[in-house]
């Protein structure tokens, strides 16, 4: 019988079978059956192989914590206190103001889930290495494909950990003793080496528009390698624009498989997006099977929004996040260079419409804004539940206590009104109402009740070809070729305008730091990457935006390690700038 040293979680969490590779306890030994006696069928092998991918699916496509770490605290999204809703101990206000502490749950999850992912992948790989694939009748190359994909999955989790926290404890087996944190450079090199090996064994997509299933192919690994080089300045203080550009050009040229920009943006996120030629890697989702909406639906939309879609079932909403406002309470535009997300979309951009499901899996618009009365079925309305209870909600690109103006419930001690006009209203992360902020319904759109069987059919894109175009564009810009950068960005932008007539294309003359950041934002809004882009441009801690003053503390470019993680593995060191007195 084989014995395996199953290491407990660094955060003390949990599940004995998770095989986490960071802990501060003596190894515990469990008796386990050998692969030869347990993995006696192809089904059993596939189940073992799939376990780390189910964790990846949760981490990347369903759990809200990774999304919140990447989007809240940036100039893109807010999770404001809405009256009595969403204060939650002030945690979301802390994220907004970069007041990070080592006891925040989302930060704990960011570390824990990435470490768990690497452990699960190595554990599965070790088991499958001992399986006789030929004896079980697998097609030639199946073993190599599975093992290489699991190694690539390890790279993904370490890349996320490096991005959020810096150097990580590095493991190549679940049988290892607990490790301290490696340096940033060591972690970077380790990820790079894993991806270099993976690229030699991963399958290359042969058919344009072939169905994506969540498996890792060569283009996904190549893009991860490009992402690593693209952010090398942030990770290891070394510029690698030329190296990143070379990989991006190879991906676009088809070296790693057949992909193409999708001319219809709704195909990328829509109800049959597994066949979009732009998708390189995505989290699968399907009605009544592996369902996920990436938390985008429930957290993004207002209360009762399901009624705007004909009372579509299984569509409760939390009325949480919204875009940073573009307008102050009086309607005057803010002037900060960053933020103001909705207002920066050109009015002729076909995405800048209220979301309307048209039927048969078709829809228009990416936003939830204005009076929420369905234009195709006017009796379908979204009514308020808090300040605007019983009224049709009007989502505004502002944040303020509008219902408190000259309201008898809000008076000072001398009997005068607390707010005599909208000009008196504060606009902060702590002073929102239920209709504050434009919402984005981009990832995992919903049908109406009539087409309820399409619900959850959209996959959650993780990597798409447009990102490769934008990485190459920024690399060209950084290397002095602004005209080449503009051409690449405009190649993507044209699909958002009728007949490709872009009224404000990128040019060599108008492309600067802020235009580049705006282009990243408009193309990838809500796709859990904004923090990384701001850090790469040295803007995350140095720029102001709505209700946020720059800290100018570069330590905050990384999150602290949760105190429970440090207690569980005392070989780990806290990131600079954090700690307890």
Question: What name fits each language-model region?
Answer:
Residues 1-21:
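Sec-dependent bacterial lipoprotein signal peptides
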Residues 21-25, 29, 78, 86-88, ...:
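Long, intrinsically disordered, low-complexity segments
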Residues 104-108, 358, 362-490:
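C-terminal substrate/ligand-recognition segments
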Residues 160-164, 169, 231-237, 480:
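Short coil/turn linking the two alpha-helices of tandem helical-hairpin repeats
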Residues 39-50, 54-60, 83-165, 178-189, ...:
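Conserved, well-structured interaction surfaces
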Residues 24-87, 199, 219-410:
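An aromatic- and glycine-enriched ligand-binding surface/loop that stacks and positions planar moieties
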């Amino acid at each position: 019988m084989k014995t395996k040293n199953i290491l407990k979680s660094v955060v003390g969490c949990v599940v004995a079978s998770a095989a986490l590779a960071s802990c501060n306890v003596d190894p515990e030994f469990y008796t386990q059956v050998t692969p030869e006696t347990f993995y006696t069928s192809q089904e059993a092998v596939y189940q073992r192989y799939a376990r780390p991918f189910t964790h990846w699916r949760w981490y990347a496509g369903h759990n809200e914590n990774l999304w919140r770490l990447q989007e809240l605290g940036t100039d893109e999204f807010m999770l404001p206190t809405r009256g009595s809703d969403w204060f939650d101990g002030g945690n979301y206000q802390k994220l907004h103001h970069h007041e990070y502490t080592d006891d925040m749950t989302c930060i704990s999850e960011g570390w824990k889930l990435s470490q768990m992912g690497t452990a699960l992948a190595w554990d599965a790989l070790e088991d499958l290495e001992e399986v006789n694939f030929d004896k079980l009748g697998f097609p030639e190359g199946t073993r190599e494909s599975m093992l290489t994909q699991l190694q690539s999955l390890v790279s993904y989790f370490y890349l996320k950990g490096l991005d959020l926290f810096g150097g990580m404890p590095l493991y190549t087996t679940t049988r290892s003793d607990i490790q301290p944190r490696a340096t940033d450079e060591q972690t970077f090199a380790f990820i790079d080496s894993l991806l270099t090996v993976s690229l030699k064994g991963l399958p290359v997509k042969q058919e344009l528009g072939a169905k994506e299933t969540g498996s890792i192919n060569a283009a996904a690994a190549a893009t991860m390698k490009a992402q690593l080089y693209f952010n090398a300045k942030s990770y290891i203080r070394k510029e690698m624009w030329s190296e990143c550009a070379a990989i991006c050009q190879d991906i676009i040229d088809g070296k790693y498989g057949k992909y193409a920009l999708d001319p219809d943006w709704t195909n990328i996120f829509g109800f049959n997006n597994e066949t979009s030629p732009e998708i390189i890697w995505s989290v699968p989702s399907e009605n009544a099977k592996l369902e996920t909406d990436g938390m985008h639906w429930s957290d993004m939309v207002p209360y009762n929004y399901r009624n705007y879609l004909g009372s579509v079932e299984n569509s409760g909403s939390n009325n949480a996040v919204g875009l940073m406002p573009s307008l102050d309470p009086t309607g005057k535009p803010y002037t900060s260079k960053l933020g103001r997300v909705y207002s920066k979309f050109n009015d002729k951009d076909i995405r800048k419409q209220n979301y309307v499901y048209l039927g048969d899996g078709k829809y228009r618009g990416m936003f939830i804004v204005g009076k929420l009365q369905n234009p195709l079925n006017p009796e379908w309305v979204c009514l308020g539940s808090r300040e605007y209870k019983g009224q049709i909600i009007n989502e505004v690109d502002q944040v303020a206590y509008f219902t408190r103006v000259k309201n008898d419930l809000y008076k000072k001690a001398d009997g005068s009104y607390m707010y005599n006009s909208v000009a008196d209203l504060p606009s902060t992360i702590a002073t929102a109402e239920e209709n504050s902020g434009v919402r984005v319904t981009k990832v995992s759109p919903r049908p109406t009740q009539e087409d309820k069987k399409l619900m959850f059919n959209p996959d959650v894109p993780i990597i798409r070809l447009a990102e490769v175009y934008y990485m190459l564009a920024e690399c060209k810009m950084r290397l002095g070729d602004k005209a080449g950068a503009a051409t690449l960005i405009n190649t993507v932008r044209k699909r958002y305008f009728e007949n490709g007539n872009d009224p404000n294309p990128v040019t060599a003359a108008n492309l600067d730091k802020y235009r580049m950041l705006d282009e990243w934002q408009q193309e990838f809004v809500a796709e859990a990457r904004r923090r990384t882009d701001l850090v790469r441009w040295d803007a995350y801690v140095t720029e102001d935006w709505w209700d946020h003053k720059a800290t100018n503390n570069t330590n905050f470019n990384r999150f602290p390690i949760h105190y429970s993680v440090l207690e569980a593995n005392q070989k780990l060191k806290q990131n600079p700038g954090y700690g307890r007195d």
